[in-house]
Structure formats: C-alpha cells, structure tokens
Design a protein with these regions (language model features):
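Active-site diphosphate/adenylate-binding microenvironment
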Residues: 15, 137-231, 358
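Flexible inter-domain linker/hinge segments
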Residues: 1-4, 149
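Thiamine diphosphate
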Residues: 12, 190-360
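Glycine-rich, anion-gripping cofactor-binding loops and their flanking helix/strand elements
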Residues: 3-9, 15-98, 102, 106-108, ...
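Extended, charge-rich low-complexity interaction segments
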Residues: 64-89, 130-151, 290-303, 310
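General structural feature for long, well-ordered alpha-helical segments within catalytic domains
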Residues: 25, 30, 82-86, 126-129, ...
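Terminal amphipathic helices with adjacent charged low-complexity linkers/tails
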Residues: 91-134
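Short beta-strand segments
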Residues: 18-20, 76-78, 100-101, 178, ...
Length: 360
C-alpha cells in the first residue's frame, strides 16, 4: 500500500467518479455519481456505463432547454478498462482528470498529465442539477439495455445470460465473472450492487484458470460461513472459450475441499463473440472472420461434464435459464454446469441498438 498524498476536489463542479478494478470507497466521494465496474465497490449514486456516451456530449436537449451533460472533472479510482466510451471520458481534453491509486501503478491515458493522489479533500457538494442529469442519463441507459433484452429479434445472447444471472443474485451470494464479454455484459445488466461479492480476473492473463478460481472462490465463501445450515451460493459466469481454456479445473484432487453450492453458467455462442462488436466484425471485413476471430469449436459440453462427473443442464432461452438458476438456488447441486446455448450473430446489432438510444 502506498499513500500518494491528498488532492483537493471542488464537488460543486460537475463531477463523475469512474471506479475500476482495485477501486475502494474513497472518503468524501460517497455522494458523487459513479460509473463502477463490477469488481469495484457498489456506489451510493450509481451511473450506468452506457450513459458515458451521453456524458461525452457538451450538452443535451431536454424539451425547450439545453442542459450541460459533460462533466467538468472525472476522478478515476483504481484501474477501469472495460468500456471504450468510459475510457473516452478519461482521455477527453475538455475534462479535468484526477487519478487515485493505493499502489505504485496509476492508470495513465494522458501521458501523466493528470493529478495523482490517494486521498481527497473535498469542498462544495454536487449540485441538484448535476445529480438530476446523472440520474436521467443513467435511467435512459438502463432502459435502453432492458428494451434490447425484451426485443425478440436479437435472439438469446450473452447479454440475456448476464441479465438472468444478475437478476437472480441475492444478498449473501458470491459471483465470479470471466473476462471478455462476460464481465462487460454483467456491467450492463446490473453489477455491482451491495451484498454480493464480485470477483473477476483481469489483465492479459484474465482467461487463465477461471474454473479453478471459481471453485476456489466457492470453497472460500463456504469456509467463511461454515456455521450456516446451507453453504452460501456462488455463481460463476463464463464464456465458452474461457470455460474450455480451463476445463481441466473440473477435476479436483481426492483430498481437496469440495464446493457445496456452485453454479457455473457457460454462455456458449460457439466462438469469440466479443469480436462481433469490434472493428473486425464489421460487415465489410468478415470474409475470414470465422477462421481468424469467430473460431467456432463445436465442443459437446454435456459430454465434457459427463466425463468429469459434473451435473449438467442445457437451456435455450432466457426463461429456461431463469428457471434453472432459481431451481439451483432452491435445491443446490454441489457443482452444476448450466450451458446457455446462445447466438453471437446479433451481437453487433444489439450494441448498435443500445448506442442509438444513448447517442453512442
């Protein structure tokens, strides 16, 4: 732990906190609107990450009036990485940026041209107008995501899987989220929130060992609450590539502690779904997309689970997944894999539909 000193922050200016991995609750910033990644503490004044597209604009039209939507300053806590629009706020030359860290490392997207510290001394307080702007922007983004999820034209996607997982979490549950689309999807569908501990591997090696980590998290959670009649619930959400990358983690040692209430949800879109919404997934660039980026594998996950002696269930719709998650919560298997057979064909259209509402 390293203390880099104190920064003075005038909260009467339109201020937005962006909290990433390794973030903590910063004294003095409790009442500031916050975009928080899933592994950050749940903020008191949450702002949906898709609202970042609204904050990127200088102002927005509301009836006969224009209101300022761009923050004057952004305070970065920890190391956010998940959303391009959010990162764009940090690099915006019109926004003053302060970065807080408790380690030797700082997130630096402006060649060091940002104020750096660990603690803050605040003056003023957020204005009612700014709080209303942030609430309205966040509500618009939340509704945009929910409207997309309700549109049958997109089929059953990884975002639907994430929504089912987050919607069925309860206070006291623990959730482990894999990298790539999984962690970004749960950020769009609700996480973080109080009462649910969230773990997610990050960085270049984020895909490594996810099943093993999820098992370890489940065992640790039940060890901490060993006096409870039923082991606390742990839910892991993994993409198919992430699941296959550590499939050997399903084999546990004979003398190792066993999970008693672990649900592993595999969002299986048969390949690299995250690339569908990136530049390489554009219609004009798809000639070799499946070979180079989509990389469909056609793996039989049911057969894998049978080989390792793991309980297995397959679902093909949001409703089936909700029912499976609810059933497992009520009568848990020690370890169960729920395979959600999803599509990635509508990924780009899905994100474009959200962007069309928030202006991204």
């Amino acid at each position: 732990w390293k203390d880099h000193g104190e920064l003075t922050v005038d909260l009467s200016k339109p201020t937005l906190v962006i909290a990433g991995d390794e973030a903590w609750r910063v004294d003095g910033l409790e009442d500031v609107p916050t975009i928080a990644e899933p592994s950050a503490p749940a903020p008191y004044v949450p702002v949906h990450p898709a609202a970042a597209a609204i904050f990127a604009k200088a102002d927005a039209e509301v009836g006969d009036y224009y209101v300022r939507t761009k923050p004057a300053q952004v305070i970065v806590v920890g190391h956010p990485t998940l959303h391009r629009r959010v990162m764009g706020l940090i690099t915006d030359p019109d926004i003053e940026v302060m970065v807080l860290s408790r380690t030797e490392d700082f997130l630096s997207l402006r060649d060091g041209n940002e104020a750096r510290g660990t603690r803050v001394k605040t003056t003023g307080e957020p204005t009612r107008e700014w709080l209303k702007v942030c609430e309205a922007a966040s509500s618009l983004a939340v509704q945009a995501v929910r409207d997309v999820l309700d549109d049958d034209a997109h089929g059953f996607t990884g975002l639907h899987v994430a929504a089912a997982v987050t919607d069925t979490l309860a206070v006291g549950d623990t959730v482990f989220v894999g990298p790539s689309n999984a962690i970004r999807d749960v950020a769009l569908t609700g996480l973080p929130f109080d009462g649910v501990d969230t773990y997610s591997p990050r960085g270049a090696a984020g895909i490594d060992g996810n099943i093993s980590q999820a098992i370890g998290v489940a065992v640790a959670a039940q060890s901490l609450r060993a006096d409870e009649i039923r082991a606390p619930r742990t839910v892991a959400l993994l993409g198919d590539i992430t699941f296959l990358h550590d499939v050997g983690g399903l084999l546990r040692g004979v003398d190792q502690p066993e999970p008693e209430n672990l649900t592993i949800v595999v969002s299986n879109d048969d390949g690299g779904g995250i690339f569908e919404s990136l530049e390489v997934g554009q219609p004009g660039l798809r000639r070799d997309f499946e070979q180079a980026f989509g990389t469909p594998h056609g793996v039989d996950i049911a057969a894998i689970c049978a080989g390792y002696g793991i309980a297995y269930q397959r679902v093909e719709s949001p409703q089936e997944l909700l029912e499976a998650l609810t059933s497992q919560a009520e009568s848990p298997e020690p370890v169960v894999v729920i395979e959600a057979a999803t599509t990635r064909a509508t990924r780009r259209a899905l994100h474009e539909a959200i962007a069309s509402v928030v202006g991204g």
